[in-house]
Amino acid sequence: MKRTYQPRNRKRRNKHGFRERMSTKNGRKVLSARRAKGRHSLSVSSAMGTAGQ
């Protein structure tokens, strides 16, 4: 049986990336919570850097 998680970087960026988070009110809430907590990476795309673009 095929597994459910078939990773794709583009899909990962588009669904969980910084711009996607910024596009909704709740997404911005997520980012501010992660900033307040002092997370090293705020979102998937910010963690990927130049290699992911």
Swiss-Prot record:
The gene is rpmH. Residues 1-16, 26-40 have a biased composition (Basic residues). The keyword Metal-binding does not apply. Keywords: Ribonucleoprotein, Ribosomal protein. One of its GO terms (biological process) is translation. PROSITE patterns: RIBOSOMAL_L34. It comes from Pelodictyon phaeoclathratiforme (strain DSM 5477 / BU-1). GO terms for cellular component: ribonucleoprotein complex; ribosome. HAMAP family: Ribosomal_bL34 (MF_00391). The keyword Ribosomal protein applies. It holds the Pfam family Ribosomal_L34. Belongs to the bacterial ribosomal protein bL34 family. This is Large ribosomal subunit protein bL34. Residues 42-53 have a biased composition (Polar residues). InterPro entries: Ribosomal_bL34, Ribosomal_bL34_CS. NCBIfam families: rpmH_bact. Residues 1-53 are annotated as: Disordered. It comes from the Bacteria. GO terms for molecular function: structural constituent of ribosome.
